[in-house]
Regions:
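Sequence-structural signature of the catalytic-core scaffold of metal-dependent phosphohydrolases
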Residues: 1-32, 40-78, 87-152
């Protein structure tokens, strides 16, 4: 399956990624603004976490290609890129203080989503969670100082 992205062109998804994309946990990202409340001031600031997550998945895959990683690691990185923001609440970072009061962050919640979707993920879910948290060296492609998340 291909998805047309205004920035990255056609993004290819394999069957596993399509199944994750169709999950309620990922589909809800269509209703969460990437820039939080900025769209209230800047009408053009309307892109969503869904669009962003597709871009991060794509860029993470490009990083994996550049690093000559094997297909298993590439799939782990792409999956982490797709799911890395599923833990965001309404209005994105503007609502993070609610989670912080419970001593959790959106990455923790995203890791819980990985657990919820584990039956649809044909990769090592523990490694995917570590990539989301930036705990593995290859996690720097998704959760580092210069990463697919910040580039998108």
């Amino acid at each position: 399956m291909d998805i047309k992205d205004p920035i990255h062109g056609y993004i290819k998804l394999n069957d596993d990624e399509k199944e994750l994309l169709d999950s309620p946990q990922v589909q809800r990202l269509r209703r969460i603004r990437q820039l939080g409340l900025s769209s209230q001031v800047y009408p053009g600031a309307t892109h969503t976490r869904f669009q962003h997550s597709l871009g991060v998945m794509y860029l993470a895959g490009r990083f994996a290609d550049s690093l000559n990683l094997d297909e298993d690691k590439k799939q782990e990185i792409r999956t982490a890129g797709l799911l890395h923001d599923t833990g965001h609440g309404p209005f994105s970072h503007a609502s993070e203080n609610v989670a912080e009061k419970r001593d959790i962050d959106h990455e923790d919640i995203s890791c819980n989503v990985v657990d919820q979707l584990s039956g649809k993920i044909n990769s090592d879910t523990d490694r995917i969670k570590k990539i989301i948290k930036g705990e593995l060296e290859i996690g720097q492609t998704v959760a580092g100082d210069i990463d697919a998340d910040r580039i998108d």
